[in-house]
Amino acid sequence: MTPDCAFDAIADGYDSQFTETTIGATMRRAVWSRCADRFAPGSRVLEMNCGTGEDALWLTRRGIQVVATDISQAMLQVARSKLAASPGGAAAHFRRLSWEELGTLDEAPFDGVLSNFGGLNCVSDLRAAARSLATKLRPGGIAMLCMMGPLVPWEWIWFLAKGDPRRALRRLRRSGTQWSGVTIRYASIAETRRAFAPEFRTLRASAIGVLLPPPYTERGMSRFPRAIKTLNRIERRLETVWPLPMLADHYLLELERV
């Protein structure tokens, strides 16, 4: 199965399975909090792997001009419908585009870019992606990259307790893991920083889901909403404290185009 078909297949159920879940929504709000500090109203932001448009909707509501891209036509259709149905009819420009095709986008320069929740984990050549992205951002522009990390104690404990060591340790495989024909790689923070240098310098790295449990634990953990709120509150205070970012389900890198 090709990457576009793989994501087409999950488009209709993505929001119910992640976006609208307690844990998924909590993690997304943590990313939004950082984006609010980096993207000013009126700025132009490129969103890569926009999925069902939840981030594009939030950005446009803040007065940000958004060009939102994804490899999946089905995801883009959900995103277009979501924005059209929103109060006031929020508007973004949608494009079918993969990371590998970024060089063909002719709407640069942008003030910022957002790649949320693991889109870059599906890219085989981070260095090539970084070079392409550098041509689309103005000097001083900000890249917000939220990626799945390789070292996740929550995952080890969860799947080992279920007697599934293969899934517990899947992120440690250097060759990546396979999902519906897509290779998913789990680059460390250090590896991603190296791939994006020298065009980008790192401003901040934070943990998204280190005390919070991973989204796939939703069925069991949603029974404890107060615990999730407490864990999130503590996590937000400690999100940049080393080594928490490198032990999180996702890490958020904030990079500046030099």
Task: Label each residue range with its predicted role.
Residues 1-40, 54, 58, 142-171:
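Conserved class I S-adenosyl-L-methionine
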Residues 111-125:
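A short SAM/SAH-binding and catalytic strip from SAM-dependent methyltransferases
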Residues 127-139:
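A short glycine-rich, Lys/Arg-flanked "PGG" loop and its adjoining helix->strand segment in the class I
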Residues 181-200, 205:
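Short alpha-helix
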